[in-house]
Amino acid sequence: MKPVDQTPTEAADYAALSALYGSLLAGLAYAARDREPIPNGELLPLSAATFALSKLIVHEKVETWLRQPFVEESADGRRPRGRRLRYAVGELLGCTRCVGAWSALALVALRLHSPTVGRTATTVLAASAANDAFQSAFSLLCERANAAKEAAAQPRDLAAARQAA
């Protein structure tokens, strides 16, 4: 991200986003005070769900509708639209880590407000994160297998070239 003085924003725009996040977090903490705490065993699934949700929002085509008012997408990449708060939100929507913080807040709020719905959403998103991990591992495995196959074929190709010469 560029420094504030190199963007069409002001520090107040980022302060507004921080104040909103802080207010939502404080409201969540206040609402949670009389509720049963989320069990420690749910931290890993919530983390995986947060990863999947933030990746979905920031990177996937299916969520273009959500980014479109704030982010200009082209073949050259993405850049925030507009100026001031709109631009700042566009920057946020281009940052997986930033969206992850908001996603975590939303998922924990959902889990505290409606435990069954929250656990269901967390399970679906955590399974999606596991799928991403498996897909990445499979792609890496295929890439390495193909590289090994090519490396093994090179000496034979060299030997065949020598025999032909």
What are these regions (language model features)?
Residues 1-165:
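Short amphipathic, positively biased membrane-proximal segments
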